[in-house]
Amino acid sequence: MSTTWFVGADWLAEHIDDPEIQIIDARMASPGQEDRNVAQEYLNGHIPGAVFFDIEALSDHTSPLPHMLPRPETFAVAMRELGVNQDKHLIVYDEGNLFSAPRAWWMLRTFGVEKVSILGGGLAGWQRDDLLLEEGAVELPEGEFNAAFNPEAVVKVTDVLLASHENTAQIIDARPAARFNAEVDEPRPGLRRGHIPGALNVPWTELVREGELKTTDELDAIFFGRGVSYDKPIIVSCGSGVTAAVVLLALATLDVPNVKLYDGAWSEWGARADLPVEPLK
């Protein structure tokens, strides 16, 4: 795996009682898994000391779009209530598929946390190593968290439209190829098929192996094979802003500069009849 932003289960087990470490459970149901009660899954068993980082609950509920970043002050209050301290080393994990931990990693970094790592292999890897789980909620004292939002981390639909029209940035779409190529319907109702004109398709699952990123050589080969240049600004997108963070994490691991996330993603673009799509029908 690529280790820049990752820690292993053995390392975390050794440091689990370190007061400068905080563990964050960021597992999340993907589209089509609406019947899952992820909060209950957390209560049924999580890494000892981990608080539950509910990406759905921590999104902007004033927006009709899913998983949009909340206001900085809203996020800061939520983190303080969870007991999260922004000056500690935060270790984020998901169920072990690397589906949602990168989104939590990106949110925390975008709101000013400097030390954030992802547990390679996630909860599944922890359990494979026969390490113990804890049941029930984790109650911590109020944390110290003052969100310092980085506006350079995210772009809006107008920025993406300009990049698509003027070719000023590469747009990478992390959705599966069948959705990108308009061969199947979107899992969310009411969205058109297709992709943003000029976008390149790098499905997030191709970057991942057993809950970790592939090696840097493998990542380079995948990006180069899809026509991505590291010398040009990059905008990452997906269905709702979650798996785009996997692509962003991979590019960060490769030290690629000037990468931003389109938070509205296809949930916004695909819902608007006034925006262009490819392939044309």
Curated annotation (Swiss-Prot):
Pfam families: Rhodanese (PF00581). InterPro entries: Rhodanese-like_dom, Rhodanese-like_dom_sf, Thiosulphate_STrfase_CS, TST/MPST-like. Catalyzes the transfer of sulfur from 3-mercaptopyruvate to a thiol-containing acceptor to form an intramolecular disulfide releasing hydrogen sulfide and pyruvate. It comes from the Bacteria. It is an enzyme of class 2 (transferase). Disulfide bonds: none annotated. Its main location: cytoplasm. PROSITE patterns: RHODANESE_1, RHODANESE_2, RHODANESE_3. Its EC number is 2.8.1.2. The keyword Cytoplasm applies. SMART domains: RHOD. Keywords: Cytoplasm, Repeat, Transferase. The active site is at C238. GO terms for molecular function: 3-mercaptopyruvate sulfurtransferase activity; thiosulfate-cyanide sulfurtransferase activity. It catalyses: 2-oxo-3-sulfanylpropanoate + [thioredoxin]-dithiol = [thioredoxin]-disulfide + hydrogen sulfide + pyruvate + H(+). Residues 17-135, 165-278 form the Rhodanese domain. This is 3-mercaptopyruvate sulfurtransferase. Residues 238-244 are annotated as: Substrate specificity. It is found in: Cytoplasm. Substrate binds at R179. One of its GO terms (cellular component) is cytosol. The N-terminal region is the non-catalytic domain; the C-terminus contains the active-site cysteine residue and the CGSGVTA motif probably responsible for substrate specificity. Contains two rhodanese domains with different primary structures but with near identical secondary structure conformations suggesting a common evolutionary origin. Only the C-terminal rhodanese domain contains the catalytic cysteine residue.
